[in-house]
UniProtKB/Swiss-Prot annotation:
Primary gene name: CST6
GO biological process: anatomical structure morphogenesis; epidermis development
PROSITE patterns, per the entry: CYSTATIN
A Pfam short name: Cystatin
Listed name of the protein: Cystatin-M
Disulphide-bridged cysteine pairs: C98-C113, C126-C146
GO cellular component: cornified envelope; extracellular exosome
Main localization, broad class: secreted
Marked site: Reactive site: G36
The species this protein was found in: Homo sapiens
PANTHER family xrefs: CYSTATIN-M
Short motif (Secondary area of contact): ranges: 80-84
GO terms for MF: cysteine-type endopeptidase inhibitor activity
């Protein structure tokens, strides 16, 4: 009878030994981020603001609108550590009175562009995925999905 429990006891002892052999850091800090884990961020975080600017600039370059859009509200922001940092942003955007021209290209300070009013006004709610690689000083819009509000 005692021998039939021996493999179970040895297995449990092995599991306990493995858990005790883990480095103290692996056991003591479960609140730290792991690679690939999504992390909620404040919309006011300066890095979130930079990622949002990059997303809006890329959106404006690819958009067929004759007017620029700018973000009006960052609803939700998350990041994921990959080969760089992926930002997942949910934002509201509004059309502005600033027209796209070949002269200005994409070098317009959108904060100086007033939001459009009346019939010209267009509001969007967008989900953006932006990859920022700080050591290469680059950002890339990977995905976006916008719907009219």
């Amino acid at each position: 009878m005692a021998r039939s429990n021996l493999p179970l006891a040895l297995g449990l002892a092995l599991v306990a030994f493995c858990l005790l052999a883990l480095p103290r850091d692996a056991r003591a800090r479960p609140q730290e981020r792991m690679v690939g884990e999504l992390r909620d961020l404040s919309p006011d975080d300066p890095q979130v603001q930079k990622a949002a600017q990059a997303a809006v600039a890329s959106y404006n370059m690819g958009s067929n609108s004759i007017y620029y859009f700018r973000d009006t509200h960052i609803i939700k922001a998350q990041s994921q550590l990959v080969a760089g940092i992926k930002y997942f942003l949910t934002m509201e955007m509004g059309s502005t009175d600033c027209r796209k021209t070949r002269v200005t290209g994409d070098h317009v300070d959108l904060t100086t562009c007033p939001l459009a009013a009346g019939a010209q006004q267009e509001k969007l709610r967008c989900d953006f995925e932006v990859l920022v690689v700080p050591w290469q000083n680059s950002s890339q819009l990977l995905k976006h999905n916008c719907v009219q509000m």
